[in-house]
Regions:
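N-terminal low-complexity regulatory segments of large eukaryotic nuclear proteins
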Residues: 1-2, 6-8, 17
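Acidic, glycine-rich two-metal-ion catalytic cores of nucleic acid-processing enzymes
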Residues: 14-63, 67-209
Length: 209
């Protein structure tokens, strides 16, 4: 999958970027996206027990991966500075297709390495369904009302924390492999709902109240 945005259907397969219509022979990829839900696809990310691509990358691909990842992160930084949300835009509309082919070619080779060298977890089906659930949660926008907090009553530290909260997308992204005990953690780019101080939790409002 090129993009995990639900409305941005696209895959890299056979050396080409394919949009809107998915190839019928797609059976393996790195991570889940909603438009793959009705297909019999396995995810290398789950085989790798949540490890990042750099952690599972074979030595002979590591240089290529570092190079394309650095350039990819530069694009993401540009979008962040320009306040362009990838929840509202498709990655393939923002990044040159030539680079996307290069990036996903390397990623596909790492993915292939994982499937060839890692055992399928005994609880793969459970992990897959759990991963799809947290994916759905990530794509639901939180109802945040920063004005509901009486700022005058907050300590200096809490005012600083509240200010920093506004840097995050109003979405919760969970890592299902975050702890050895099986508890979820928030990913670094997630709204930090699991670690929010009690004094600030009132900014989160119900969706259907």
């Amino acid at each position: 999958a090129i993009d995990d945005n639900k409305s941005c259907v696209g895959v890299y397969s056979g050396g080409e970027l394919i949009f809107n219509k998915l190839p019928e022979n797609l059976t393996k990829t790195w991570k889940y996206a909603a438009y793959l839900d009705n297909m019999d696809v396995e995810y290398a990310y789950i085989y790798a027990n949540g490890q990042q691509l750099a952690e599972v990358c074979p030595e002979h691909l590591l240089g290529d991966w570092k190079r394309v990842k650095k350039k990819f992160e530069a694009y993401l930084k540009t979008f962040q500075i320009a306040k362009v949300s990838l929840y509202d835009n498709c990655l393939y509309d923002l990044v040159p297709h030539g680079f996307l082919k290069e990036f996903f070619n390397v990623r596909n080779n790492i993915t292939k390495h994982v499937f060839e060298n890692y055992d399928k977890p005994d609880n793969y089906d459970f992990l897959s369904e759990t991963y799809k659930t947290v994916y759905d949660i990530k794509h639901q926008q939180l109802n945040i009302d920063y004005n509901s907090i009486q700022k005058a009553s907050l300590s200096h530290a809490m005012k600083g924390y509240l200010h920093n909260l506004k840097k995050y997308e109003k979405r919760c992204s969970y890592n299902i492999f975050g702890t050895k005990t099986g508890r979820f953690t928030n990913t670094p780019d997630s709204f930090p709902i699991l670690t929010m101080p009690k004094a600030l939790r009132g900014v989160i409002k119900p969706q259907n109240d």
